[in-house]
Amino acid sequence: MNVLSYSINTLEGLYEISGVEVGQHFYWKIGGFQVHAQVLITSWVVIVILLGSAIVTVRNPQTIPTDGQNFFEYILEFIRDVSKTQIGEEYGPWVPFIGTLFLFIFVSNWSGALLPWKIIELPHGELAAPTNDINTTVALALLTSIAYFYAGLSKKGLGYFGKYIQPTPILLPINILEDFTKPLSLSFRLFGNILADELVVVVLVSLVPSVVPIPVMFLGLFTSGIQALIFATLAAAYIGESMEGHH
């Protein structure tokens, strides 16, 4: 009897999981355009968190740093080390860009696990981490593509395009294709990992609501930080590669 009751409860949990929908969106109509409201709302929240934390912490810097100031200085030093390792001695101008990518993705990823987005009801769909939406990750990847094209052109001028026929002109199609696959790999890697993490938590909460999800959520926080680091590191590596001209 207990086995039958457990089986029924399990089936009910699976039925609830089947009701979880992925891909519903809430739009604002502005003029003749449809604006993806979910992404904008959650992205604005993340930006406010970042700006608010920075302003509160560093608006009055101390000679003897406070804990908050120490934390932000550590983050800056960490981002500088990543940028210098991947880009080289000309890393300086790119620290703000790499840092912005890292912090935005990091806070966005963590917001999916730590902020109660689901208590805010929308007419369609529900709020989630900005990086849980393919529009956000593609936009970040395209910004990275623009950045490494700009880095290469500003360093070498039109001679930058000579890389497409190196070491032999036969590789021209492959070298061109490579520049399309870079943003694709960046965007889909980040999107897939964050979406999968949130779906796993939803499934486990539906099946075992009190015990299993907790360690999985901690694992999700860890992998979210790793994904932010991977994205920022690869972005810096692509910029350094375009400036150096080697693959």
Curated annotation (Swiss-Prot):
Instruction: Describe the protein's quaternary organization and the partners it interacts with.
Output: F-type ATPases have 2 components, CF(1) - the catalytic core - and CF(0) - the membrane proton channel. CF(1) has five subunits: alpha(3), beta(3), gamma(1), delta(1), epsilon(1). CF(0) has four main subunits: a, b, b' and c.
User: PANTHER family in the record, alphabetically?
Assistant: ATP SYNTHASE SUBUNIT A, CHLOROPLASTIC
Q: CDD domains, from UniProt?
A: ATP-synt_Fo_a_6
Q: Which UniProt keywords apply?
A: ATP synthesis, CF(0), Chloroplast, Hydrogen ion transport, Ion transport, Membrane, Plastid, Thylakoid, Transmembrane, Transmembrane helix, Transport
* Location (main, coarse): plastid
Name this polypeptide is given: ATP synthase subunit a, chloroplastic
- What is the top-level taxon of the source organism? Eukaryota
Outline what the protein does: Key component of the proton channel; it plays a direct role in the translocation of protons across the membrane.
Provide the family line: Belongs to the ATPase A chain family.
Species this chain originates from:
Populus alba
- Gene symbol? atpI
- Could you name the Gene Ontology cellular component terms for this entry? chloroplast thylakoid membrane; plasma membrane; proton-transporting ATP synthase complex
Under Gene3D superfamilies, the record lists: ATP synthase, F0 complex, subunit A
Q: Name one GO molecular function term.
A: proton-transporting ATP synthase activity, rotational mechanism
Bilayer topology: Multi-pass membrane protein
NCBIfam families reported in the protein's UniProt record? ATP_synt_6_or_A
The record lists the membrane-crossing segments as: 38-58, 95-115, 134-154, 199-219, 220-240
A Pfam family this protein belongs to? Answer: ATP-synt_A
